[in-house]
Amino acid sequence: MAEKQELSKEQRILRAAEQVFSRKGYTDATLDEIIKIADTGKGTVYKYYGNKDFLFYTLIHGKNEAFLDKLKVSCDAKLPFMDRLHGFLLEMLKFIIKNKMLWRVLIVQAIAAPSGWCFVWNDKKHDLDIDVQWGSKPTPEEVAIKKKYTMILRSEIAVLVDILQEGIDSGIVKPIIDLPLVAANIFFGSIVMISQTRRADINLNEDVDIMVDRIMNGHKK
């Protein structure tokens, strides 16, 4: 209880939200359970966040911003290509290990399309198009909710795209036809790998070295 009281109301709510969303996913999470764990009033939660979606977004956005700040240091454009690649993969694995369940929930919110539609990136517009594969067109509210989560994931993948593009431009990496797709596969594949591993003796530097080897040997001239 003492630790709870040392935190601000917002911090207690976000910490409780992380516990509940990580354990139950988005759909089954309830504000009532979050309120109980945070040891605060319902009115306080609604005052700061309004609804479950905005609370989840605030939690995810905060973690995303902190992650991107770390990547700015470890993947600084002034660093050599291999250092940037290694730095990205190391920070990514550390981040996923810490937030693996929460980021799986994020992916479901951003990508899962039970209503039969998804986003497709449009290079000319530099924006997302809606691809309705079956069923009816989504409402503007549905598009807005899913888009903000999709853009969070894209912001993280974009860092790897930039690094690999540098490798291509400098002649270290051969041209890649669909660079964003390759970067996304590396990113999402890492989340799946971390989510499914039961190893207690993970050596991040060794794992990163293996990933760098696979990436470079797959695309090296």
Predicted regions and their residues:
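Short, hydrophobic secondary-structure boundary micro-motifs
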Residues: 104-106, 173-176
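Helix-loop "lid/cap" segments that line or gate small-molecule binding pockets
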Residues: 90-97, 107-115, 131-136, 214-219
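Amphipathic alpha-helical packing segments from all-alpha helical-bundle domains
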Residues: 116-170, 180-181
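C-terminal peripheral helix-coil segments that are non-catalytic and often amphipathic
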Residues: 94, 158-173, 182-221
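Alpha-helical DNA-contacting segments of helix-turn-helix folds
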Residues: 57-63, 70
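Basic, helix-initiating cap at the start of DNA-binding domains
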Residues: 1-24, 28-40, 54
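Hydrophobic alpha-helical connector segments
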Residues: 58, 73-101, 183-186
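Short hydrophobic/aromatic patch on the recognition helix
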Residues: 39-49
